[in-house]
Amino acid sequence: MRVGIGYDVHKLVADRKLIIGGVHIPYEKGLLGHSDADVLLHAIKDAILGAAALGDIGKHFPDTDERYKGANSLELLKEVSNLIKSKGYKIHNLDATIIAQKPKMASHIEQMRANIAAAINVDMDSVNVKATTTEGLGFVGVGEGIAANAIASIIKA
């Protein structure tokens, strides 16, 4: 078994959709980024790539490449899953945490889990997503951004 960790953060700004875990979350702001800025899926992709010692999303999907402008992170997650399969691995388990003061994530968690499980072709019981706040502290606490971290375990297929 191999394990990787991932972390991502994006700034909250006006005039952007808030997409987390492939779910559009109604909110007054969205995350700024080259792609859809799905902070959760970015952390998960980095964790999977790290577990396979295949670098990070910046290497595979650089923000200098116009092909990835506005890209759907669920589609890129499928690409990462296919890449590790081509290297002889399969995803065993994912655990991720969204760190956001607002909006509340609880009502969206199950759909996020379903989206992730479908994208990487695993059962939902292999995917855990949870959310927490920073109790008003730091850039997340004052509503300037949202962060996520993830851990992935992979095994030989």
From Swiss-Prot:
<dbReference type="InterPro" id="IPR003526">
    <property type="entry name" value="MECDP_synthase"/>
</dbReference>
<feature type="binding site">
    <location>
        <begin position="56"/>
        <end position="58"/>
    </location>
    <ligand>
        <name>4-CDP-2-C-methyl-D-erythritol 2-phosphate</name>
    </ligand>
</feature>
<comment type="subunit">
    <text>Homotrimer.</text>
</comment>
<protein>
    <recommendedName>
        <fullName>2-C-methyl-D-erythritol 2,4-cyclodiphosphate synthase</fullName>
        <ecNumber>4.6.1.12</ecNumber>
    </recommendedName>
</protein>
<comment type="pathway">
    <text>Isoprenoid biosynthesis; isopentenyl diphosphate biosynthesis via DXP pathway; isopentenyl diphosphate from 1-deoxy-D-xylulose 5-phosphate: step 4/6.</text>
</comment>
<feature type="binding site">
    <location>
        <begin position="8"/>
        <end position="10"/>
    </location>
    <ligand>
        <name>4-CDP-2-C-methyl-D-erythritol 2-phosphate</name>
    </ligand>
</feature>
<feature type="binding site">
    <location>
        <begin position="61"/>
        <end position="65"/>
    </location>
    <ligand>
        <name>4-CDP-2-C-methyl-D-erythritol 2-phosphate</name>
    </ligand>
</feature>
<keyword id="KW-0456">Lyase</keyword>
<comment type="function">
    <text>Involved in the biosynthesis of isopentenyl diphosphate (IPP) and dimethylallyl diphosphate (DMAPP), two major building blocks of isoprenoid compounds. Catalyzes the conversion of 4-diphosphocytidyl-2-C-methyl-D-erythritol 2-phosphate (CDP-ME2P) to 2-C-methyl-D-erythritol 2,4-cyclodiphosphate (ME-CPP) with a corresponding release of cytidine 5-monophosphate (CMP).</text>
</comment>
<feature type="binding site">
    <location>
        <begin position="100"/>
        <end position="106"/>
    </location>
    <ligand>
        <name>4-CDP-2-C-methyl-D-erythritol 2-phosphate</name>
    </ligand>
</feature>
<dbReference type="GO" id="GO:0008685">
    <property type="term" value="F:2-C-methyl-D-erythritol 2,4-cyclodiphosphate synthase activity"/>
</dbReference>
<feature type="binding site">
    <location>
        <begin position="132"/>
        <end position="135"/>
    </location>
    <ligand>
        <name>4-CDP-2-C-methyl-D-erythritol 2-phosphate</name>
    </ligand>
</feature>
<feature type="site" description="Transition state stabilizer">
    <location>
        <position position="133"/>
    </location>
</feature>
<dbReference type="InterPro" id="IPR020555">
    <property type="entry name" value="MECDP_synthase_CS"/>
</dbReference>
<feature type="binding site">
    <location>
        <position position="139"/>
    </location>
    <ligand>
        <name>4-CDP-2-C-methyl-D-erythritol 2-phosphate</name>
    </ligand>
</feature>
<feature type="binding site">
    <location>
        <begin position="34"/>
        <end position="35"/>
    </location>
    <ligand>
        <name>4-CDP-2-C-methyl-D-erythritol 2-phosphate</name>
    </ligand>
</feature>
<feature type="binding site">
    <location>
        <position position="42"/>
    </location>
    <ligand>
        <name>a divalent metal cation</name>
    </ligand>
</feature>
<keyword id="KW-0479">Metal-binding</keyword>
<dbReference type="Pfam" id="PF02542">
    <property type="entry name" value="YgbB"/>
</dbReference>
<feature type="site" description="Transition state stabilizer">
    <location>
        <position position="34"/>
    </location>
</feature>
<feature type="binding site">
    <location>
        <position position="8"/>
    </location>
    <ligand>
        <name>a divalent metal cation</name>
    </ligand>
</feature>
<dbReference type="GO" id="GO:0016114">
    <property type="term" value="P:terpenoid biosynthetic process"/>
</dbReference>
<dbReference type="GO" id="GO:0019288">
    <property type="term" value="P:isopentenyl diphosphate biosynthetic process, methylerythritol 4-phosphate pathway"/>
</dbReference>
<keyword id="KW-0414">Isoprene biosynthesis</keyword>
<feature type="binding site">
    <location>
        <position position="10"/>
    </location>
    <ligand>
        <name>a divalent metal cation</name>
    </ligand>
</feature>
<dbReference type="InterPro" id="IPR036571">
    <property type="entry name" value="MECDP_synthase_sf"/>
</dbReference>
<dbReference type="GO" id="GO:0046872">
    <property type="term" value="F:metal ion binding"/>
</dbReference>
<comment type="similarity">
    <text>Belongs to the IspF family.</text>
</comment>
